[in-house]
Amino acid sequence: MKKKTKKVEPIQMNTSVKRRKFLNLRMPKSSDHFLHAAMIILMLFGIIMVGSASMGVAGGNNRFLVITIVKQVVYAVAGYTAMTFLANRFQLKKLKSSTTFLVILATIASLLLCLLFAETNGARAWIRIPLGVTEVTLQPSEFAKIIAILVVALYLGDNVHSYSKRFDLIKRPLFIDGVILFIVWILQSDFGSMAVIFVIICVCFLVPNHLQLRGYQRILTILFYGVVLLGFYILSPSGEHLIMKMTFLKTYQIKRFISAINPFMDQYGTGYQLISGLISFATGGWFGKGLGNSVRKYTNFPAASTDYILAIVVEELGFVGFIGLLAVYGFIIFVLLRYAMKMRSEKGRIILVGTAMYFLVHMFFNIGGVTGLIPLTGVPLLMVSAGGSSTMSIMACVGISQAVIASYRRGEIR
């Protein structure tokens, strides 16, 4: 007698295959593995430096130090999971307005939710979640940076030729990104995040090659150079008087401008952390004092693991460590821009350029603030500063970029 064999139902097979694909945490074969390796290096380096920089804040409290490191590891794992998930699941052709609009609404709702929580450093930009012995904070404005990039890609990429009027072309992205900027700057009072989002949007807006956009792009370019020149003038001794006339800035923001010009005017107040950071830079030398051997982190340096972590990096690893960190950032930006220059898909190019600018603008604002070249904005050093929102957000953004790169290398987009 022939043995009866059970037939596997096609539906069950399809379901199991889909489940394996959904839970797949490996990067696509067609993704850029060098970019992936650079992200892992930054992720591990960030965990190590957060642990080192937090020793001073812990003040011998080993429990606090362990909790801080564990939180950073959890954030890194969550970010890595988001990166691999999006690298496998994100598709440009499925970037449709209906789905994206729901994400936009959720982002705006979370931004408004921050207003219910207490103010920190002059801004209401965080959602605080008590979790046993610690507290988890989320900053929705970090995730809004991804949304801002996708909004420009959705409405200005590839399909813009169907519009007959110039304003019809930009009204939707202008409105959505305008609402995000309004909430972050006016309602949350988070000038640093607003500035980062604004610069990213402006650069992404310059990417599409469309006749009806060129007039707006020229105006935007002129305004950009004008703002840069005005900034240089304000931060010069002759332009210092203009700072006091900026009524749209809060008192603490005006003090940051003044501290950037001369931190010794308030060396025990707003200028204290900047002076401490500059001392760390000066004492680091070429090769630093060694990992974990920073002296300044044991002084009153509360932002040592966040805004000023670069000062601890330079003090412990020296100028060589600083150049090495810049090299990793530079490599990531180079890879993203190289693929953006190669491909014709404007949606893909906008996403890649936006992700590159995400890295570049954060680098500029953080390094500039720590060294006193520009006022401190509270913008973290991506993947290195303590905090989960910026780490998870940038890794998710790189995951989307890797999906675009993989599609390009497979020939699915040009």
Where are the model-predicted features located?
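Membrane-helix boundary/helix-loop-helix interface segments in multi-pass membrane proteins
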Residues: 2-7, 19-29, 33, 49, ...
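Alpha-helical transmembrane segments of multi-pass membrane proteins
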Residues: 39-55
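Hydrophobic alpha-helical transmembrane segments
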Residues: 74-79, 316-336
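Structural signal for the C-terminal ends of transmembrane alpha-helices
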Residues: 82-93, 152-161, 202-213, 235-236, ...
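Hydrophobic alpha-helical segments of polytopic membrane proteins
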Residues: 100-101, 171-183, 192-245
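Interfacial segments of multi-pass membrane proteins
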Residues: 195, 201-215, 295-321, 380-392
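Hydrophobic, glycine- and aromatic-enriched re-entrant/interface helices and adjoining loop segments
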Residues: 216-319
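Loop-to-helix entry and N-terminal half of a specific, functionally important transmembrane alpha helix
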Residues: 338-377
